[in-house]
A protein has these predicted regions:
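DNA major-groove recognition helix of helix-turn-helix
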Residues: 186
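Alpha-helical bundle regulatory/interaction domains
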Residues: 1-163, 167-169, 174-179
C-alpha cells in the first residue's frame, strides 16, 4: 500500500512529500514507472542484500525522461522523499541533470545524505519513527543549504503547473527574462 505524508513547514519549499510503500506480492510483478519530473531519495527497508538498492542506504532516483519497468519478486518496503523541482540543488552541488535516469548511492559523493546514519534508521521500530528520523536529519541541514536562484525555481514550478504546455515566449514574459538570459541559465 502506498501512503504520502506532508513535510514539516520549514521543509515545504524543498520537499513535496514523503511517501512509503509496503507491497505484499504473490509472485513476480512488473510495475511501469512513468516520468513525472521529480527527483526522489529512496530508502529500501527490506533487509535483503540481493537487492540492487542496499537496505537503509539513501539513493537519489533522478528525473526520468522515459518510462521504466521495475520487476518485483517479493514484498517491497520503501520510504521516499520527493523533492520539488530543482530543490535538491539546495542539498548538493552536483547539477540536477547528472541524476537524470539514474539511481545513485548518496554515500558515493558529497551530498545531502553524505553523513546520514543508516544504522540508526534501521533501528527505528516503525514507519513513522523512520520518517521522523529522516525529517529531523533534513531539518538539521537547513542551516547549510546551497543558494538556489529563486527565478530558476519559479520557472520549474511554472512549467510543472502548465504540464509543460507553455510556449517559451509566454514563459519568458511570465518570469521576466530575455531569451538570451534564459538560454544562459537553462
Amino acid at each position: 500500500m502506498y501512503r504520502e505524508y506532508k513535510p514539516n513547514i520549514l521543509l515545504a519549499p524543498y520537499i513535496e512529500t514523503y511517501w512509503a510503500t509496503d507491497e505484499s506480492l504473490s509472485g513476480r510483478q512488473t510495475l511501469r514507472i512513468l516520468p513525472d519530473g521529480d527527483i526522489n531519495v529512496l530508502f529500501n527497508l527490506a533487509e535483503n542484500e540481493v537487492d540492487i538498492i542496499k537496505p537503509f542506504i539513501p539513493y537519489i532516483i533522478g528525473t526520468k525522461t522515459t518510462f521504466s519497468n521495475v520487476v518485483h519478486e517479493r514484498a517491497d518496503r520503501m520510504i521516499g522523499v520527493r523533492f520539488r523541482p530543482c530543490a535538491i540543488s539546495a542539498y548538493t552541488k552536483v547539477p540536477v541533470y547528472e541524476f537524470n535516469n539514474c539511481r545513485v548511492d548518496t554515500s558515493l559523493f558529497l551530498s545531502l545524505f553524505a553523513d546520514f546514519n543508516s544504522e540508526r534508521l534501521a533501528e527505528k521500530e516503525d514507519e513513522i519513527e523512520r520518517l521522523n528520523y529522516i525529517e529531523e536529519y533534513l531539518l538539521g541541514k537547513l542551516n547549510c543549504l546551497n543558494n538556489i536562484d529563486k527565478q530558476f525555481i519559479y520557472v520549474a514550478e511554472y512549467i510543472r503547473m502548465t504540464n509543460g504546455m507553455v510556449p517559451v515566449n509566454k514563459l519568458l514574459d511570465k518570469v521576466c527574462l530575455s531569451q538570451r538570459q534564459f538560454e544562459r541559465q537553462f
